[in-house]
């Protein structure tokens, strides 16, 4: 199987821009103006549907089609039936217990149209179908191979887990120093109410005591699009790894979270076994988040998204520089679409130390977060550096030995752990952003970003580490 993210070429232009390594060069980049046309770029899903690929598009996201295109589709479905291949409009369910190979032998592929981020994810099971699709679409669309793995910058250290002490007072009062403003905000009734917080991670243990009292909107994004006969369901959140549960606890845990009254929207996009994900899964996760945020009841509410994940610093073995750069630009467009939708993207800078910068933290659209301990010392692992004229990180957050929830054990015992990493610092800053958006919901995402940067507590220089504007605080 081959997977591609299809992006309209009309949204790509050549201009001088800082390159992926920080060098000035002429390269193809996704422009802000034409990126806004993505939502109506329906030629790709129309053509893929006509070729017999199965649709796995979110409900309500398919674009309208003309009568001519509808007749073309029906003709394609009839042809598929005559040749023994199940077309995309077939009502025949898959055989119970059928293997992936058996199922893919009955259809040429599948696709997921994502209008809110302006792209289509296509999976081709047969080379000749890919060739047909390229013949139909390659003049107008860039086929970006979904081959570069993303992963979260794993915690660099963790304390021994321990069961929750049920006699313990609110951890928010103990964990967050007065200087960061969180205790004062909570005392003033500013706790994140009315703000939507999106998390792209390994998931969340929705029955952990930190999260069980709230309704969490949750979506597991599978490697392959869901069958229309077995669509994705809204289920109780789960997390086999614990990383996402820890991140959610820092930002929004009811006992020790920075913003305990936000509404959580969690997309599980990272495999617990490999701690990796792909551009396509992250794209689907972002599309789902924007779909939730744009519902009529949510359309005027402020939102923040936390991304404790990133691309490797260099193309992995076997991945060309060109494919790597295309993946970067597609990811940058997704981050930009968050900002265009008035959603603030908060991104972990990475755990590779000074003079190293990863993506998406290096994108100017991201609010990149480095890590300090509770004494304001910069963590040795915190990534920092310069990409062209951009200095990363933008801001610092508490990211050393941060106490938060992890997944429950098989005996239903709830555990907490101390973990370190910029993965922990980012949700702290996301929580601070949620507090600002709670207090002033009419501020735009860019205005909230500026507020966080202007209110930061300056930090002393620490060797070659860069600390941006300083420690994020609420005041």
Swiss-Prot record:
Major subcellular site: cytoplasm
Subcellular locations according to the entry: Cytoplasm; Periplasm; Secreted
Alphabetized InterPro entries for the sequence: Peptidase_S8/S53_dom, Peptidase_S8/S53_dom_sf, Peptidase_S8/S53_subtilisin, Peptidase_S8_His-AS, Peptidase_S8_Ser-AS, Peptidase_S8_subtilisin-rel
Biological process according to GO: proteolysis
Disulfide bonds: none
Domain Peptidase S8 positions: 165-475
Active site: 201, 243, 423
Enzyme type, top EC level: hydrolase
Activity regulation remarks: In non-starving cells, secretion and protease activity are inhibited by formation of a cytoplasmic complex with PopD. In response to starvation, PopD is degraded in a RelA- and FtsH(D)-dependent manner, thereby releasing pre-formed PopC for secretion. Secreted and active during starvation, and rapidly degraded upon secretion. Secretion is significantly and reversibly reduced by carbonyl cyanide m-chlorophenyl hydrazine (CCCP), which dissipates or reduces the proton motive force (PMF), and by nigericin, which affects the pH gradient.
GO molecular function: serine-type endopeptidase activity
Record region (Disordered): 1-27, 57-106
GO cellular component: cytoplasm; extracellular region; periplasmic space
Phenotypic effect of disruption: Disruption mutant does not show any signs of fruiting body formation even after 120 hours of starvation. Sporulation is strongly reduced. The precursor protein p25 accumulates as in the wild type strain, but p17 is not detected.
Keywords carried by this UniProt record: Cytoplasm, Hydrolase, Periplasm, Protease, Secreted, Serine protease, Stress response
EC number: 3.4.21.-
Keyword Chaperone: no
Pfam family, one: Peptidase_S8
SUPFAM superfamilies: Subtilisin-like
Cited function: Required for fruiting body formation, a multicellular developmental program that is induced in response to starvation. Acts as a subtilisin-like protease that directly cleaves the CsgA precursor protein (p25) on the cell surface to generate the intercellular C-signal protein (p17) in starving cells. Preferentially acts in cis, i.e. PopC secreted by a cell only cleaves p25 on that cell. May also be important for processing of other protein(s) that are important for development.
Family the UniProt entry places it in: Belongs to the peptidase S8 family.
Subunit structure: Interacts with PopD in non-starving cells.
The name this protein goes by in its record: Subtilisin-like protease PopC
Record organism: Myxococcus xanthus (strain DK1622)
Gene it is expressed from: popC
């Amino acid at each position: 199987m081959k997977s591609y993210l299809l992006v309209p070429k009309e949204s790509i232009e050549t201009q001088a821009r800082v390159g992926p390594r920080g060098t000035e060069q002429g390269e193809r980049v996704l422009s802000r103006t034409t990126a806004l046309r993505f939502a109506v770029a329906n030629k790709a899903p129309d053509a893929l549907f006509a070729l017999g690929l199965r649709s796995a598009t979110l409900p309500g996201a398919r674009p309208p089609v003309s009568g001519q295109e509808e007749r073309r589709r029906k003709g394609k479905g009839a042809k598929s039936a005559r040749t023994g291949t199940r077309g995309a409009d077939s009502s025949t369910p898959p055989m119970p217990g059928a293997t992936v190979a058996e199922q893919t032998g009955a259809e040429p592929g599948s696709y997921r149209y994502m209008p809110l981020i302006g792209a289509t994810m296509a999976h081709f099971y047969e080379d000749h179908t890919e060739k047909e699709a390229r013949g139909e679409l390659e003049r107008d669309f860039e086929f970006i191979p979904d081959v570069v793995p993303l992963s979260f910058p794993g915690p660099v250290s963790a304390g021994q887990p321990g069961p929750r002490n049920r006699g313990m007072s609110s951890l928010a009062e103990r964990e967050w120093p007065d200087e960061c403003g969180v205790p004062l905000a909570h005392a003033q009734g500013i706790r994140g109410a009315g703000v939507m917080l999106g998390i792209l991670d390994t998931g969340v243990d929705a029955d952990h005591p930190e999260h069980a009292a709230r309704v969490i909107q949750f979506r597991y994004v599978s490697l392959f699009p869901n069958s229309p006969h077995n669509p994705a369901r809204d289920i109780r959140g789960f997390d086999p790894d614990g990383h996402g549960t820890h991140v959610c606890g820092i930002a929004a845990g009811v006992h020790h979270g920075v913003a305990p009254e936000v509404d959580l929207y969690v997309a599980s996009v990272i495999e617990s076994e490999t701690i990796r994900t792909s551009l396509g899964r992250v794209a689907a996760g972002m599309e789902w988040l924007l779909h939730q945020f744009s519902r009529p009841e949510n359309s005027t509410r402020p939102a923040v998204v936390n991304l404790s994940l990133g691309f490797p610093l260099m193309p992995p073995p076997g991945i060309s520089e060109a494919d790597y750069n295309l993946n970067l630009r597609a990811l940058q467009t997704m981050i930009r679409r968050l900002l265009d939708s008035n959603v603030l993207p908060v991104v972990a800078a990475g755990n590779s130390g000074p003079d190293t910068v990863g993506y998406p933290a290096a994108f100017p659209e991201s609010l990149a977060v480095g890590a300090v301990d509770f004494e304001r010392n910069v963590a040795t692992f915190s990534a920092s550096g310069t990409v062209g004229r951009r200095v990363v990180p933008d801001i610092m957050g508490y990211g050393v030995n941060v106490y938060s929830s992890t997944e429950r054990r098989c005996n239903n015992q709830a555990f907490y752990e101390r973990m370190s990493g910029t993965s922990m610092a980012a949700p702290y800053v996301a929580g601070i952003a949620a507090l600002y958006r709670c207090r002033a919901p009419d501020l735009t995402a860019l205005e909230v970003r500026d507020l966080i940067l202007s209110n930061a507590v300056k930090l002393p220089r620490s060797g070659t580490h860069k600390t941006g504007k300083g420690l994020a605080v609420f005041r």
